[in-house]
Regions:
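Hydrophobic, Leu/Ile/Phe/Ala-enriched alpha-helical segments that form helix-helix packing faces
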Residues: 12-16, 50, 150
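S-adenosyl-L-methionine-dependent methyltransferase catalytic module, highlighting the catalytic core
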Residues: 101-115, 119-221
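Short, flexible hinge/linker loops that cap or flank conserved catalytic cores
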Residues: 18, 51, 205-206
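Helical cap/lid subdomain of alpha/beta-hydrolase-fold lipid enzymes
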Residues: 1-4, 27, 195, 205
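Conserved SAM-binding loop
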Residues: 22-132, 143-147, 215-217
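A structural signal for well-ordered alpha-helical scaffolds and beta->alpha junctions
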Residues: 2-9, 39, 43, 139-143, ...
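Short N-terminal helix-initiation segments at or just after the protein's N-terminus
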Residues: 1-8, 33-40, 153-154, 158-160
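Class I SAM-dependent methyltransferase Rossmann-like catalytic core
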Residues: 1-21
C-alpha cells in the first residue's frame, strides 16, 4: 500500500461513525510487521486512528503470521459463510483483487459478508506496474468499472488517487525497490509474458494511480 492511498483510506473511514464500523474485517491484511514496520503508514494512517476511536479490528489473510487473527481461503464457501455470520459491520480490502483469478467472484463473496447498512472500502490499482503476489492478473479497472463489481452497494465516495511515480518510491525506500528489481531480474514474467524489469522502467516517471472506493451496502444479497 502506498502512502497517499493509506491517507485517503484513513480520511474516508474517519467520516463514518465508529459504531457503524465496529467490528471491522481487514481482508488481505499481511502481517503486523508489514503494517507497522515495512509500511508503517498503514498502521499510522488507518488502524491506529481506528483503535483510538474504539473500532474493533480483525486481520484476515490466506497465510498465518504474527498480527493475523484469521487465516483462510476466500474461495472456500464454508469459510466465507462463517465470516458472514461473525457480525462484522465493515470490511476493508486493499490491493487484493488484482491478485485473484476472478475478481468479480471474490468481490461478490466479500459483499455478502457485510449486512445491509454496513460499509465496505476497497482499493485496486488503476494504473500500476506488475507486482505478483503470487500472481498479478493485471486487473486495472476504471473507477466506474470497479464500482460495478458491487451491485448491492451505493458509492459513498470514490477517487482515483495519484500516488506518485516509481522515482518517488525509489527515493522513499530504495531497499524495497532494490528487492523488487532483484526479483524481476531473477526471471519473473508478468501477465502476457513480458519481463517484469523491462516493463517497469517506464514507471520511473509514470504516475501510480489507485482506485479507492467507500461503499455502503443498501440491498441484500
Amino acid at each position: 500500500m502506498l502512502l497517499a492511498e493509506a491517507r485517503w483510506i484513513g480520511k474516508a473511514l474517519a467520516r463514518v461513525e465508529p459504531e457503524k464500523l465496529s467490528p471491522l474485517l481487514n481482508v488481505g491484511s499481511g502481517t503486523a510487521e508489514t503494517r507497522e514496520k515495512i509500511q508503517p503508514w498503514i498502521d499510522r494512517e488507518i488502524f491506529a486512528p481506528l483503535r483510538q476511536r474504539g473500532v474493533a479490528i480483525q486481520h484476515l489473510d490466506i497465510q498465518e503470521g504474527e498480527g493475523i487473527d484469521l487465516h483462510g481461503d476466500l474461495y472456500d464457501d464454508a469459510f466465507v459463510a462463517r465470516l458472514g455470520g461473525s457480525g462484522y459491520r465493515s470490511l476493508l480490502c486493499c490491493n487484493v483483487l488484482e491478485h485473484v483469478e476472478n475478481p468479480a467472484a471474490i468481490a461478490a463473496k466479500l459483499e455478502r459478508i457485510i449486512p445491509v447498512g454496513g460499509y465496505l472500502l476497497f482499493t485496486v490499482p488503476n494504473s500500476y506496474p506488475y507486482h505478483p503476489d503470487p500472481i498479478d492478473t493485471m486487473y486495472r479497472p476504471s473507477l466506474e468499472q470497479f464500482v460495478q463489481l458491487f451491485p448491492h452497494c451505493n458509492l459513498v465516495e470514490g477517487a482515483v488517487q495519484n500516488c506518485g511515480t516509481g522515482w518517488d518510491f525509489v527515493e522513499r525506500n530504495p531497499l524495497v525497490m532494490f528487492a523488487k528489481v532483484k526479483r524481476r531480474l531473477a526471471g519473473r514474467t508478468e501477465h502476457g509474458g513480458t519481463k517484469g524489469t523491462a516493463s517497469f522502467l517506464p514507471w520511473l516517471f509514470k504516475s501510480f494511480k489507485i482506485n479507492c472506493v467507500l461503499l455502503r451496502k443498501e440491498r441484500g444479497t
